Amino acid sequence: MKPYLLLTPGPLTTSETVKETMMTDWCTWDEDYNLHIVEALRKELVGIATRNTEEYTSVLLQGSGTYCVEAVIGAAIGKNDKLLICSNGAYGDRMGNIAEYYHIDYELLAFDETEQVSVDYVDDYLSNNSDVTHVAFVHCETTTGILNPLKELAHVVKMHGKKLIVDAMSSFGGIPMDVSELGIDFLISSANKCIQGVPGFGFIIARRSELVRCKGVARSLSLDIYDQWETMEKGHGKWRFTSPTHVVRAFKQALTELIEEGGVEARHRRYCENHRVLVEGMRSLGFVTLLDDAIQSPIITSFLYPKTGFDFKAFYTALKSKGFVIYPGKISKADTFRIGNIGDVHPEDFARLVEVVRETEY
């Protein structure tokens, strides 16, 4: 099969060295794995998330990022709590679906998919609804690529004394942030996003005191984040159930490569440059971005169809034949396609993509 670059928001293109680490088998009971890989990366994750490493901890969970979102909602929201979900896309809406399944008391504030979650609206809602105990939203909503105002929203949530859950699936490791400074209680992300690992597990960066409060609350055995965390703490990296060993080892390598690149700030600069080269090039060909530049993330970029009758499938196939895989659109109000800027991809790759698009019939 002809190799290609995944210009998608995860799974994404990984380095050869990340792939190579999966060629070795690991024993889930061995210290070489649990202590030197799992425990080491748990500490590294907290170090990436905050300078306040004593107050925060991390827990890893098998499955996709959504498993972790469901696990947090199912364990952090008690029977007498109320969750406010602020949504401007499919992944915020999914939080509502999870709350519905668990019969959790919640309210969903729905915003337009091409507009940020309104800080003023959230502030007003919390001022008039004192029964809310937790607030959740998506930082980078990959439905469109929109970046919600994390700092401002976090400030409002903490000003009202609420617990904060942030889905940072597609931003953690690629956009600088400090969970302690922001007052985040639970941050959720996944191995196959900005850290540039492969799919197979997600992780939660949690305030220790809030994670302890999850004891006995979880509505699912396999998604019990307190029990998973306690097992890892006492077992020095041991997982309750079968660990995705190859994926974990690849993630450890990906973390090493993040540090070698210069950390989150350096990776963010590369993603921003990828985005700049892509957008400038596509605009020169007549393509129009869905979002205003001011609210656009450097993670994934949505473009409007260039004309009526545009055949996305043919366009997709043509690009794939030249070594690039892109994403279809995910919103109902406009015909779009999406191009991811994250992964082991660089500005020269996007310059080459633009030339391929220039030569493509569409």
UniProtKB/Swiss-Prot annotation:
Belongs to the class-V pyridoxal-phosphate-dependent aminotransferase family. PhnW subfamily. Its EC number is 2.6.1.37. It is an enzyme of class 2 (transferase). It catalyses: (2-aminoethyl)phosphonate + pyruvate = phosphonoacetaldehyde + L-alanine. The modification N6-(pyridoxal phosphate)lysine is found at K193. InterPro entries: Aminotrans_V_dom (IPR000192), NH2EtPonate_pyrv_transaminase (IPR012703), PyrdxlP-dep_Trfase (IPR015424), PyrdxlP-dep_Trfase_major (IPR015421), PyrdxlP-dep_Trfase_small (IPR015422), SP_NH2Trfase/AEP_transaminase (IPR024169). Keywords: Aminotransferase, Pyridoxal phosphate, Pyruvate, Transferase. This is 2-aminoethylphosphonate--pyruvate transaminase. The gene is phnW. Homodimer. The keyword Transcription does not apply. GO terms for biological process: organic phosphonate catabolic process. Its cofactor is pyridoxal 5'-phosphate. Gene3D superfamilies: Aspartate Aminotransferase, domain 1, Type I PLP-dependent aspartate aminotransferase-like (Major domain). Involved in phosphonate degradation. One of its GO terms (molecular function) is 2-aminoethylphosphonate-pyruvate transaminase activity. The keyword Transferase applies. SUPFAM superfamilies: PLP-dependent transferases.
